[in-house]
Amino acid sequence: FYYRRVSRVNLYSIENFEDYFYGFMVPSTGYLQYYDVFPYEDGFMLQFPDKDTRKVAEFEPAKKLFYTLKTSRDWGRMLEIDTIGALNDVIAAGKTQQMLLTQEALFEDRIGKLAQQIVSEGDRKFVMIAGPSSSGKTTFSHRLSIQLAARGLNPYPIQLDDYYIDRALCPRDEDGKLDFECLESLDVELFNHDMNELLSGKTVNLPIFNFKTGKREYRDNYLTLGKEDVLVIEGIHGLNDKLSY
């Protein structure tokens, strides 16, 4: 609480356990009727219900996601920065730059191991990257491409954004605004056509989306996949099963 700007805090208790929580909590656990909690890995899994049916969906383990979360937790403990308070201590001590450089070194090492795994699998032609808007997908794809190139492959970063349909045809959300994040905003048919053509050894003129005009353009961006070539494809729907067929 050293860095808090207010002198009062709310403490919550249940039986003999008391703790601080960063948000508001219900007056009693009796309000919480629809949920599931069970041991998972070295912790617990807490599941919330569907907002309409109030039913808790069947649990489907996301092993890669849990591995990533565990790695992040382990890094925080190793650097002794596993809480916001500890992070504030580092900043107050003027060690921000050292922390950033250390984190970058750890991340680059992880990217290198990922690249080595891709190379060792041998027959990979597609590397798919997904994440929400402004999460660093493009930056990550380029960093991964550098590591792949250092291991003898010829990576070609591709942005799914270049497969947007013309802006005039883009779906709108419930507020009437253009919805660039829905799968329907992408020309899935064209994407599948181009990828299949590349896999069959044909030369493809890849599109480039002009965000100023809101239209797709072709600028002699030709590509033919060779033996050591690999496509590094990134976008919001990079891991969406409905993207490919």
Name these PLM-found stretches.
Residues 1-109, 114, 119-122:
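Auxiliary tRNA-acceptor-end handling modules of aminoacyl-tRNA synthetases
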Residues 127-131:
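Hydrophobic anchor at the beta1->P-loop junction of P-loop NTPases
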Residues 156-158, 165-214, 230:
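Conserved nucleotide-sensing/catalytic segment adjacent to the nucleotide-binding pocket
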Residues 139-144, 159:
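Hydrophobic positions on the alpha1 helix immediately C-terminal to the Walker A/P-loop
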Residues 146-156:
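Post-Walker A helix-loop "phosphate-sensing" segment adjacent to the P-loop in P-loop NTPases
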Residues 233-245:
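ATP-dependent NMP and nucleoside kinases share a basic, alpha-helical "lid"
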Residues 122-123, 225-227:
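Short loop/turn elements that form and flank the Walker-type P-loop nucleotide-binding site
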Residues 136:
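Conserved glycine(s) of the Walker
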